Amino acid sequence: REQRRMAGAEALKAIRARTGTAQSAAPAKKVDGKLYKDVKTNCKKVVALACSTGGPKSLQQVIPMLPRNLDAGVVLVQHMPAGFTASLAQRLDEMSDVQVKEAEDGDIIRRGHVYIAPGGKHLRIVKNGSGHKIQLSDEPAIEGLRPCANIMYESLERCDYDEITCVVLTGMGADGTKGIKGLSDRHKKIYVIAQDEDTSVVYGMPKAIAQTGLVNEVVPLNRVAEVITKNVGVS
């Protein structure tokens, strides 16, 4: 037991040290939306993002850099306990041109809006007439995770988006990989962006999806917002 405790302490120390070095990359810049005006117009698009360890700080280099008129809604799963995601959403909203909120059951997914899965809830995206909405549930945790990114991605199998931009940022483990692979297996049109190893606090989740061969672009943290915008455009 003592050996496990010491090993855990060493792992935590390594993550803390890595947090400092990973975030020392050049800061991200706000994306100039005018550069991406005529990108994939007249189609339904969504951005589905997953992150874990190191995610809250990394999201500050992504969400506030997105243009206000991003031509897609953004739904994201950040592994956090209940009670913490509301303050994360508020902080990001204050920093951003896009509107950011903690997701509520029944929220209609709108362009230029970001919805963060509440800690302690699973989040699904479901069809709602000609659009889509958010559905939350208290189902049991999956491999210790609630919210779980795989649940979010798997729900998109039953949606009618023309393209799904999947983004995987820093995090321990492999959450998101199974769900994204499922989208590919069902011939959904996906575009996959993964954070690179150098800027990841923990290169677990991005590595797992990269190893599937499904990733379209591997980019440093300071380019994630630009690549998202380049792929979905602005309205």
Please describe what each predicted stretch is:
Residues 1-235:
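Strand-loop microenvironment adjacent to phosphate/nucleotide-handling motifs in alpha/beta enzyme folds
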